[in-house]
Amino acid sequence: PITDGCRPRTKAEIRALRSYAQDLEADIVALQEVGSIAALGQVFPPSDWQLFLSQRPDSETYECRESGRQSTQQKVAFAVQNDIEVLGETDFTALGLDNPGLRHGMELTVSTPLGEMDILNVHMKSGCFEDDFSRSDSEACQTFARQAPVLDDWIEAKEREKTPYLVVGDFNHRLSSPYNKLSMLMADNSNGAKSNLVNATASLIGCHPYYPAPIDHILMGQLQSPALIS
């Protein structure tokens, strides 16, 4: 894994990533654009972490900008501390729309001091940054428009079941915008019940000088206030 990809990581970079992962002091880490379990294990040692990788079939590789190097796979993954009980894992294939070029999501069910929780890790279609994706005729937004109700259906199911849940990952979309259509869709339960969905990252601003609005988010729902505080 260290020698693969468009720009292979150096040993020093791997050490830096491993150090960063330790400094997070996180129990569960959701990742995107992971090539393999072996690559994941270089940053999250299996002696300390349970590693989970999407079962999405490998997509066709391509040459990276005439460099002579071949791309690696892009799959979602989880690293979970060994003392956390994982009760189940499911590939969320519906997000791929039966298109081999689109990423699957991945769902974990974990045991917490407050009960079971479902965590969905997503990496949605890139290239659609319109607040209202339905008003764009770009291929990216048309694809995103098909993924949006799939994600909303998953959230609505958890809302109906009153199951504590998180949705995390790379949405490739500025959900914190006040007129974002996907945010409004997810916050509106079709049965008329009040939504418990909260975007925990809504107030954050990125440090990139040209792209300050984040596209990576942490959404949560059906959590009691002690869970939010902790």
Predicted regions and their residues:
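Conserved beta strand-loop-helix elements of the APE1-like EEP
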Residues: 35, 67-89, 111, 210-228
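Active-site-proximal beta-strand/loop segments in catalytic clefts of secreted hydrolases
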Residues: 32-35, 54-57, 81-82, 90-92, ...
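Metal-dependent phosphoester-hydrolase catalytic domains
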Residues: 98-101, 112, 153-166, 172-230
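Beta-strand-turn-beta hairpins that frame and shape the catalytic cleft
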Residues: 83-86, 100-131
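Acidic/histidine-rich helix-loop elements
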Residues: 1-12, 127-143
